[in-house]
């Protein structure tokens, strides 16, 4: 298929494609110059020329294969591309006269420069063509914007009317509605008009690659829109018949979902209840432990208090005993004091009586 497409579609070659890259030996081009040279030099030149020819043939074959692959890919991606066949380029290259071996070296040296320039020029041309194609597409869209908007509005209005009619009929009847022929033909007529207008404008412009590509893309988009419209109409016809069943299925699905949610919530509640019972048991255990600790602390405190009270009682009893002893000793001391006073008084009396006796005796003696 690819070869047939390549043979049928013309291809455009680069303006440097006709440069002679492959050439034969120097004996064919200039037979009279090599007669005066030595045999050894001719043999070395012949071997070098054969090796160069083989290398050039390989390069040429590789280039032809690459060009053919690129053309096949272009034909597969873009069905209509103006290109020339690679066979014509090859024939033109073979028809050119063969160059001298001295010129071959210079051409080989300059070939890379020529190729770079060719690539730059082709890239610049490609960018310019892209810009032109984009500008043309924008201009076409702006020119026919009103027509596109009118077509879209009519299609949307027809869709809305059909949906309303189908809803009304669905309320009274379950059978689906069909699209009217007038609406269908009107949409087909509008799409055909848009296609004709786009095709006429594209023919008026230059028949370049990118313009045709834009036309193909526009046509494909219109076809896809038409297909979508047809699928929507057919879908709306079938939807009215299946809406009731879908509602029933949705209700059943909702009921099942609610049941599943209830079961899941019941399981969660049961888990929470189990957790609560476990925590209650732990709380009771902790409470009992705390009560035991309180009792132990209270008992320890009571023991300490009882010991202190006993010590206080003992001290008080000792104090009482000591006070009693002190009082008794104080009373005995007072008694002793009184006795001493009495004795002192008696001594004083006794001494006074003895002095009076002495005085009387002294008087008597005198």
UniProtKB/Swiss-Prot annotation:
Subunit structure: Interacts with PRKG1 and IRS1.
Region entry Interaction with IRS1, spans: 1-95
GO annotation (BP), single: positive regulation of insulin receptor signaling pathway
InterPro entries: GKAP1
Region (Disordered): 20-110, 147-177
Function comment: Regulates insulin-dependent IRS1 tyrosine phosphorylation in adipocytes by modulating the availability of IRS1 to IR tyrosine kinase. Its association with IRS1 is required for insulin-induced translocation of SLC2A4 to the cell membrane. Involved in TNF-induced impairment of insulin-dependent IRS1 tyrosine phosphorylation.
Disulphide bridges: none
Main localization of the protein described in the UniProt heading: Golgi
Coiled-coil spans in chain: 47-77, 128-160, 243-353
UniProt keyword annotation of Coiled coil present: yes
Keywords, in A-Z order: Coiled coil, Golgi apparatus, Phosphoprotein
Transmembrane domains' residue ranges: none
Compositional bias of kind Polar residues: 39-50
The organism's place on the tree of life at top rank: Eukaryota
Protein known as: G kinase-anchoring protein 1
Subcellular locations according to the entry: Golgi apparatus
GO molecular function annotation: identical protein binding
One GO location term (cellular component): Golgi apparatus
């Amino acid at each position: 298929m690819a070869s047939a497409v390549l043979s049928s579609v013309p291809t455009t070659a680069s303006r440097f494609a006709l440069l002679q890259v492959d050439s034969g030996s120097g004996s064919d081009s200039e037979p009279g110059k090599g007669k005066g040279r030595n045999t050894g030099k001719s043999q070395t030149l012949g071997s070098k020329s054969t090796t160069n020819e083989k290398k050039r043939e390989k390069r040429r074959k590789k280039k032809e294969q690459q060009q053919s692959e690129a053309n096949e890919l272009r034909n597969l991606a873009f069905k209509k591309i103006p290109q020339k066949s690679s066979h014509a380029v090859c024939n033109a290259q073979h028809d050119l006269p063969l160059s001298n071996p001295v010129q071959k070296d210079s051409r080989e040296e300059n070939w890379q420069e020529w190729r770079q320039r060719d690539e730059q020029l082709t890239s610049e041309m490609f960018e310019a063509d892209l810009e032109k194609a984009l500008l043309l597409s924008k201009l076409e869209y702006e020119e026919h914007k009103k027509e596109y908007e009118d077509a879209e509005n009519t299609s949307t209005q027809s869709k809305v009317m059909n949906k309303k009619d189908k809803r009304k009929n669905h309320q009274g009847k379950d059978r689906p509605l069909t699209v009217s022929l007038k609406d269908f033909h009107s949409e087909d007529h509008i799409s055909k008009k848009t296609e004709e207008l786009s095709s006429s404008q594209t023919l008026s412009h230059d028949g370049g690659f990118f313009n045709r590509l834009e036309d193909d893309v526009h046509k494909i988009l219109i076809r896809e829109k038409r297909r979508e419209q047809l699928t929507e109409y057919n879908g709306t016809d079938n939807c009215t018949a299946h809406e009731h069943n879908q509602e029933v299925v949705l209700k059943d699905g909702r009921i099942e979902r609610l049941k599943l949610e209830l079961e899941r919530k019941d399981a969660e509640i049961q888990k929470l209840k189990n957790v609560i019972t476990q925590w209650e048991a732990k709380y009771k255990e902790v409470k009992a432990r705390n009560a035991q600790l309180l009792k132990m602390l209270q008992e320890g405190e009571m023991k300490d208090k009882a010991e202190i009270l006993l010590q206080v009682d003992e001290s008080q009893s000792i104090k009482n005993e000591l006070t009693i002893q002190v009082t008794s000793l104080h009373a005995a001391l007072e008694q002793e004091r009184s006795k001493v006073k009495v004795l002192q008084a008696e001594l004083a009396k006794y001494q006074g009586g003895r002095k009076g006796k002495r005085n009387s005796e002294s008087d008597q003696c005198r």
